[in-house]
């Protein structure tokens, strides 16, 4: 935390805040690490299966802990359905594509459906009632409420809750409705930036996978190709570790295009959204 953030949170003076931060830094080993040490840390990363082998392969094994994975696309492209699948799969053992933990869902659009969780759980060999017990969800009614929930999640994990997946569906809904017009764009992006950094800190500190869904808009000045573009601007584009564009395909299928990833090539895969969750074509 910065001195300003500590002052705002605790009420101490900035001088005291600086002293606290310097003391904490002196007690931490904040030196550089070798590439081999960093590689060993990467070996502890867990990847949660999407339910589709083709989709998992596109993402390098699944949704990664310690990272933010963003899926954006038009209405009905499968973003929320993937979230439901992940909320079940995170409960599975690691050898079955899970993380042996629970999911926490921040719902800004009222799209979570517990009955879908039950159907996916049954198809995955889990007890539907137990799957719902191993799940926490909350409705966010504005952007401040949404941001406050991230602080609450950090507190829950610190107190021992085995949360391994945080789902925000959707990230931008409240930000778009509360900050309208170009005159408020700078304020919106600044607030969004703070929110994203809290999500990143949560992912890195607690080795949690963060899955966010995002809305899209059409670029009016684009006459050729797909005019669809994710909302949120460069602030969101840079914060997401993995970014996928989802769209409808032929005969009810969905197409996922990997747009950005640290060490993976761009690519596409096809998957299905069924009554029992995400499946291969």
Each language-model region and where it sits:
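Flexible glycine-/small-residue-rich
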Residues: 73, 107, 139, 170, ...
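The Walker A/P-loop phosphate-binding site
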Residues: 7-10, 20-130
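Conserved inter-motif catalytic segment of the P-loop NTP-binding fold
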Residues: 98-184
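Amphipathic alpha-helical transducer elements in NTP-driven molecular machines
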Residues: 48-52, 56, 65, 80-81, ...
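Conserved catalytic network of the ASCE P-loop NTPase/AAA+ motor domain
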Residues: 61-63, 93-99, 124-131, 155-161, ...
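Small-residue hinge/turn detector
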Residues: 13-14
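Solvent-exposed alpha-helical segments within well-ordered globular domains of core cellular machineries
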Residues: 4, 8, 18, 22, ...
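Phosphate-binding/switch region of NTP-binding enzymes
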Residues: 189-281
């Amino acid at each position: 935390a910065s001195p300003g953030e500590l002052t705002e949170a605790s009420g101490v003076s900035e001088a005291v805040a600086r002293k606290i931060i310097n003391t904490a830094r002196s007690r931490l080993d904040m030196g550089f690490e070798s590439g081999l040490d960093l590689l060993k840390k990467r070996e502890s990363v867990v990847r949660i299966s999407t339910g589709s082998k083709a989709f998992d392969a596109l993402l390098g094994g699944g949704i990664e802990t310690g990272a933010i994975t963003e899926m954006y696309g038009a209405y009905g492209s499968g973003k929320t359905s993937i979230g439901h699948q992940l909320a079940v799969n995170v409960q599975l053992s690691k050898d079955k594509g899970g993380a042996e933990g629970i999911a926490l869902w921040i719902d800004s659009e009222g799209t979570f459906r517990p009955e879908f969780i039950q159907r996916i759980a049954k198809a995955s060999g889990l007890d539907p009632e137990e799957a719902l017990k191993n799940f926490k969800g909350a409705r966010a009614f504005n952007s401040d409420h949404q941001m406050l929930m991230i602080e609450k999640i950090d507190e829950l994990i610190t107190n021992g809750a085995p949360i391994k997946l945080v789902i925000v569906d959707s990230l931008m809904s409240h930000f778009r409705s509360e900050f309208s017009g170009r005159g408020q764009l700078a304020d919106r992006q600044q607030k969004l930036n703070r929110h994203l950094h809290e999500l990143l800190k949560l992912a890195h500190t607690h080795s949690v996978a963060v899955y966010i869904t995002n809305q899209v808009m059409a670029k009016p000045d684009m006459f050729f190709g797909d005019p669809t573009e994710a909302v949120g601007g460069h602030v969101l584009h840079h914060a997401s570790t993995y970014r996928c564009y989802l769209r409808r395909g032929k005969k009810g299928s969905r197409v996922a295009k990997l747009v950005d990833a640290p060490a993976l090539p761009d690519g596409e895969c096809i998957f299905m959204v069924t009554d029992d969750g995400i499946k291969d074509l």
